[in-house]
């Protein structure tokens, strides 16, 4: 789920945001955020964070129990250049036993329950130090309020549409999520978690190294939008040949920036021949 390197063409109207976009200043830091991101289609889950400070030599994050979960120190030329914005994401293991996955991936499954047991909700402390030992501090909240996965993704050649879901796709179905709420593992069922915004992405599925691979359309729209659809500019679609394989992603972004994405394979500029089925 490398959506943080997307390039949004200048011709595309809207804002290309990322799931790790902090929503407010963070004390001494310009931004800081810790969040959970789920891909409901692939069925994987990860921890992401972002911090943005000024002229730092080192940066660190402690969880609500005071356990250090991340530390970074500048060395050599980076010590001269300094640290400012730091973003990272954990490995994203499968959260279900996917029968089509590699054997190694199936051995490393981390269920939703396992993941929530590993991480502690609450206040995460971000700290950084500069040349003279001056200290920057900021706090952000990690919650287990996980928005439900979008469903019914469609692309008609120019418009991407979707609907509101009620579970986490391959990571957990509705009934299992209800059990986790009743057991006190989850504070709220995902179907009841408010969506602050929807992140919508269209990207081609081309060979590695193909320049077209960086031409990705990304936009965010308000979570309370009544009409859940986005029109993709024709100027963007004109960059691709007929029958170019691609995919669309729609992410439900919660108030604490936790995000759940769903993706679907599509055919860009499809004609009567359609895209070849690689399967």
Regions found by a protein language model. Give the residues of each.
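Surface-exposed beta-loop interaction hotspot
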Residues: 111-116, 120, 129-165, 169
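Extracellular Ig-like/FN3 beta-sandwich strand-entry sites
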Residues: 119-123, 227, 241-247
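Gram-negative bacterial Sec-dependent N-terminal signal peptides
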Residues: 1-22
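Ligand-binding face of N-terminal immunoglobulin V-set domains in extracellular IgSF glycoproteins
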Residues: 95-126
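Short beta-strand elements
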Residues: 134-149, 258-279
